[in-house]
From Swiss-Prot:
Taxon lineage: Eukaryota, Viridiplantae, Chlorophyta, core chlorophytes, Chlorophyceae
Location(s), subcellular: Nucleus; Chromosome
Pfam family, one: Linker_histone
Chain intervals with Basic residues compositional bias: 133-142, 227-250
InterPro entries: H1/H5 (IPR005819), Histone_H1/H5_H15 (IPR005818), WH-like_DNA-bd_sf (IPR036388), WH_DNA-bd_sf (IPR036390)
Coiled coil regions in record: none
Identification of the protein by name: Histone H1-I
Function, in words: Histones H1 are necessary for the condensation of nucleosome chains into higher-order structures.
Keywords noted in UniProt: Chromosome, DNA-binding, Nucleus, Repeat
Source superkingdom: Eukaryota
Biased composition (Basic and acidic residues): 41-50, 143-198, 251-261
Length: 261
């Protein structure tokens, strides 16, 4: 190659890419001064709502109802939950106003089992020994309470009697003078009777003495005596028949006297 040969033309280097333009800085906006907020008017305190008192349950507590159901059903292996529910609804249904009664009963029974008040046996429930002992102790107390209540009634009766006596007492005081007047009048009436001569009564006594000889009609008595033995069958009562024979002797004497004449 000759020196005169031209050097190879070198392409001009590509111009360097202009550097990425830096983001323009935003001019800070002039913030308007905050206006102070007007103070809020104080809220008036609300009147507290009156809480309605919860109506006291008219039924006994659940433990008492469950205990009553188990003791009255007297099932050997315990009472199931449906049996307890049925018994309680039949006996206390009018007093139970809980819509979720079945759910609350199942929850209550579970808590009683955890607390040791009930014993679960294959889906049935029995009373624990502690509850059985309490049930036995509670029965004599009721009997004693009934016995103590009866004497109170008897003690109250004498008070009424005393009150009646007190009310009657003033009436007697008012009536006493009337009785005394009546007694005076009766005494005055009785005195003229005593003045009557007793001699007038003596002839009556004499008349009575004369009337005494009525026993002459005694001979009729044998007929009555004869009538009585007819009713009596025993032979011992037949003996009175001899009596008329003795009394017939006067007739025989009269016959003898006539014969002598």
């Amino acid at each position: 190659m000759s020196e005169t040969e031209a050097a190879p033309v070198v392409a001009p280097a590509a111009e360097a890419a202009p550097a990425a333009e830096a983001p323009k800085a935003k001019a800070p906006k002039a913030k308007a001064p905050k206006q102070p907020k007007a103070p809020k008017a104080p809220k008036e305190p609300k009147a507290p709502k009156e809480k309605k008192p919860k109506a006291a349950p008219t039924h006994p507590p659940y433990i008492e109802m469950v205990k009553d159901a188990i003791t009255t059903l007297k099932e050997r292996n315990g009472s199931s939950l449906p049996a307890l529910k049925k018994f309680i609804e039949n006996k206390y249904g009018k007093d139970i106003h809980d819509k979720n009664f079945a759910k609350t009963l199942s929850q209550v029974v579970k808590t009683f089992v955890k607390g040791g008040k009930l014993v679960k046996v294959k889906g049935s429930f029995k009373l624990s020994e502690a509850l059985k002992a309490k049930a036995k102790k509670s029965t004599p107390k009721k009997a004693k309470a009934d016995g103590e209540a009866k004497p109170k009634k008897s003690e109250a009766k004498p008070k009424k009697a005393e009150a009646v006596k007190k009310t009657k007492a003033p009436k007697e005081k008012v009536e006493r003078p009337k009785k005394e007047k009546k007694e005076k009048v009766e005494k005055k009436k009785a005195t003229p009777k005593a003045e009557k001569p007793k001699k007038a009564a003596t002839p009556k006594s004499a008349g009575k003495k004369k009337a005494t000889p009525k026993p002459k009609a005694a001979p009729k008595s044998p007929a009555k005596k004869d009538a009585k033995p007819k009713k009596a069958t025993p032979s011992k009562k037949a003996a009175p028949k001899k009596a008329p024979a003795k009394k017939s002797t006067p007739k025989a004497k009269e016959a003898k006297s006539k014969g002598k004449k």
